[in-house]
């Protein structure tokens, strides 16, 4: 994204180690990014975003309290007519990841979680090949903020 001229990029991860690896991979370009180490359900964004992309964090939220908190944060943090892209394990995907339980979603169940504040654009379900040569079934949905 940086190479394409995007600015005001924020990256949030619960893992400081993951953030450090990403910074090292980006080299000098890492200084152009706002890096946040936090649990997304504790995140209080100081700005609103045009675009929010989450690939494989949402499915680690397994309680209704955490799920609802995430949805509320996304609704508040994304600008009107902004976009939300989510990728989670599908109902045919793994039930655990990195030793942790996950919540699986269908295109319908994920859309239902966000229907109050967002209009669904499109959902697709697809297989993802991991670096360990295993297959994981994901559902990806895109939404537009109402």
How would you name each of these model-derived features?
Residues 1-47, 61-146:
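Class I (Rossmann-like) S-adenosyl-L-methionine-dependent methyltransferase catalytic domain
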Residues 50:
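Conserved acidic residues
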Residues 56-60:
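Short catalytic micro-motifs in class I SAM-dependent methyltransferases
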